[in-house]
Design a protein with these regions (language model features):
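Glycine/tyrosine- and acidic-biased, solvent-exposed loop/turn segments at the edges of beta-strands
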Residues: 1-181
Length: 181
């Protein structure tokens, strides 16, 4: 029966502490540079498995993710250096699957996208820094279902030429097609 053996590897300023089972990393592994944590990860028989936390040089987490069979799997959080959430994404078997959101450093939502098996599936929305909708486009299995609808930061639709639609024209179109207003 094989036993778990502690292992420490040092090279220059980097130190890796963990354990091996049958010669493969097994269990929690801590990686440090100059005495500061770089990553805390977990292995099962040499394969990334379970929770992992990565750190900025200052010590704050830069990412908290989950692994299964060596691939990202589950909720992943990515942080700004000050600790605020920059991105939340969901993975299944190493590809995006589920809702993904990205925020600006001030906490304003910048993008919300839905994925299925690594492809956009559902509505993609992007926002201006003031929080107003900038783009909206539905997708099915990675393919756009219609052209993106784009908006100015004061909520006016953009015409095909990229210029804001005049308010009178926007009003007129809303009368002709109330469901698109």
């Amino acid at each position: 029966m094989e036993t778990i053996q502690p292992v420490t590897i040092e090279r220059d300023d980097t130190r890796i502490e963990g354990a091996t089972l049958g010669g493969a990393l097994h269990g929690p592994v801590r990686i440090e540079t100059e005495g500061r944590p770089v990553a805390m990860i977990r292995y099962t028989n040499g394969v990334l498995s379970g929770p992992a936390t990565y750190f900025y040089p200052e010590g704050n987490p830069s990412a908290q993710v989950q692994y299964a069979s060596g691939k990202l799997d589950g909720k992943a959080l990515f942080y700004y250096p000050d600790g605020k959430i920059q991105r939340e994404a969901h993975y299944a078997h190493g590809v995006l699957h589920g809702v993904s959101r990205t925020w600006l450093a001030d906490g304003t939502l910048l993008e919300e996208a839905h994925y299925r098996n690594g492809k956009l599936h559902g509505v993609l929305q992007r926002f201006h820094p003031n929080g107003c909708l900038a783009l909206r486009q539905p997708f099915n299995a990675g393919k756009p279902l219609e052209a993106a609808k784009r908006y100015t930061d004061d909520r006016r639709p953009l015409a095909a030429d990229g210029k804001p639609l005049p308010r009178w024209k926007q009003w007129w179109q809303s009368l002709a097609n109330p469901s698109s207003a």
